[in-house]
Amino acid sequence: MNRRRFLGYTAFGSATVLSGSAPFGCAPFEAPGDAPASDEPFELHEATVADLQAGMESGRWTARSITEAYLARIDALDGRGPELRSIIETNPEALSIADALDAERRSKGPRGPLHGIPVAIKDNIDTHDRMTTTAGSLALEGSIPPRDSFLAEKLREAGAIILAKANMSEWAYWRGLKASSGWSARGGQCRNPYALDRNPCGSSSG
């Protein structure tokens, strides 16, 4: 399998903001016999943040079109195909945020290098929006923090689009050291995109 095909399996956004890690082994787990994702081309899967900014500056892409592409990619890889379970939930306001940032770019120019760039953040990073923050647990299901975390606040100020909450090892491994890496009650078992019968290792598995 070549590098482009590997990248095509794993890409869902241009940047992923993660916190924390844990030095545990990548043990195999019992996985359903899903076929890998199709080889249909995904135009943005190797794009860097600089590439995306250049594309928006030239008019080739907009924040909305990029966001739509990554939402479709999440659906293709998490909801169908290999079912990576890398994402716990997506932001229902992502497209309206993208539209507002496109309008701002037209009227004032970009705020900076993250303007209009979709990012996914770990599910233990507070966001005050229509997404919940649960550390992957059912105990906190439905929990909406009263304010953004410092990280989320700074991302929004920079013009980034908080696209989704990434799956993680529940409670960032505080539920037990023998727990499977990348498993949470809300997200299920996150799968290693390079070897679908193995886990992705670490707390920040999504």
Can you describe what each PLM-predicted range is?
Residues M1-S14:
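N-terminal secretory signal peptides and thylakoid transit peptides that target proteins
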Residues P32-G206:
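Gly/Ser-rich catalytic/binding loops embedded in alpha/beta enzyme cores
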Residues V17-L18:
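Membrane transport/envelope proteins' first extracytoplasmic loop
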